[in-house]
Amino acid sequence: MIPLGEFLVEDEVTFNESRRKVLRLAQALGFDEIGATRLAMAYSELCRLGVDRPGGVRTHLGLEEQPGGLALGVDFAFSANTGAPLVADAFFRSFTAIPGAAWSYRGLLPLPDHCFRLDEELLESLRSRLAHPSRE
């Protein structure tokens, strides 16, 4: 996976900040308003499972080469057993446990533009957006 950024979601502030950034990332990757909002909603629902627990939930975002083009990958590493997140199967094309990582899952969602090309300038721009605080 080509890493884009990561978040430790452990309270309301980090939850809201990371959700906004995921929404903007989805828009930058070519998802329409509905697709971007659905991704942010699924991300929110999954983060809610771990946000109030000690250690929160760590998320990693990246792009992964898949047959037919790139996919957005979102890893969720929970600090405790949350059970299998049911909402994920309804949204991600693939949602599986990460081998060897307790309570960790990877969701994959193909980018809407199968011809999407990632260059170094765009990659650095996406990483910068995720790394710096939102202005809201």
Language-model features: where?
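Helix-loop-beta hinge of the Bergerat
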Residues: 2-31
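Conserved ATP-binding N-box helix of the HATPase_c
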Residues: 31-58
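Generic alpha-helical secondary structure
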Residues: 15-18, 32, 36, 40, ...
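GHKL (Bergerat-fold) ATPase N-terminal catalytic module, capturing the glycine-rich phosphate-binding loop
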Residues: 26, 33-40, 96-100
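Conserved beta-strand-loop-beta-strand hairpin that lines the nucleotide-binding pocket
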Residues: 1-4, 49-136
